[in-house]
Design a protein with these regions (language model features):
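Catalytic cores of phosphodiester-bond hydrolases, prominently lipid phosphodiesterases
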Residues: 1-178
């Protein structure tokens, strides 16, 4: 029992962001997801859990119509109103769109500058950044950390976890204030 209480106490201090990739029609899918989530008040009322919808999205102007526990994945090339931006949890983009072309690692200085400019613009909006469809290997993860990418997209969760632990850089475990 003591271990269970300890783990509960530890989870209170941690944040979880659940990124849901909507692949079907946005409005009906999100409406159904909201109905299901409302059955779990311990999730939707927990300020340490953020549910972010990516992929297919409803019109930006309707973001305000969704409950406070629903957030959206934004794009830098959109001109959001202040209200719409307040429902954006992060800004994501296709890695190859950011650098301008598909290229073998490592990148040249022009591509690195494009990536850094993108990341800086997102951070100026006060939002975390995620690059999707990016190289999924330690050299890329290291570069993303150096650039200030906030969320590393990966299909290799265990490898990324091992990489971060071996890197012994605890700053990536600090809770975000964003």
């Amino acid at each position: 029992m003591a271990i269970h209480r300890y783990l509960q106490q530890q989870m209170v201090l941690r944040k979880l962001q659940l990124l849901v990739d909507v692949k079907t029609e946005a409005i009906s899918t999100i409406d159904r997801l909201v109905q299901i989530l409302k059955k779990y008040p311990s999730i939707i009322q927990n300020k340490n859990i953020k549910i972010v919808l990516s992929g297919n999205a409803p019109p930006d102007s309707t973001f305000k119509n969704y409950p406070d526990f629903i957030w959206f994945d934004g794009r830098l090339n959109k001109n959001y109103t202040t209200s719409e931006l307040s429902k954006i949890a992060l800004i994501s983009e296709d890695y190859y769109k950011v650098i301008g072309y598909k290229f073998i690692w490592p990148l040249d200085s022009v591509s690195i500058d494009k990536a850094k400019q993108f990341i800086d613009k997102v951070h100026q909006l006060g939002k975390p950044v995620r690059l999707w469809a990016s190289p999924d290997k330690p050299a890329a993860w290291e570069q993303f950390m150096q650039w200030g990418v906030d969320l590393i997209n990966t299909d290799k969760i265990n490898d990324l976890a091992d990489f971060i632990i071996q890197r012994n850089d605890c700053e990536y475990f600090k809770p975000s204030n964003k």
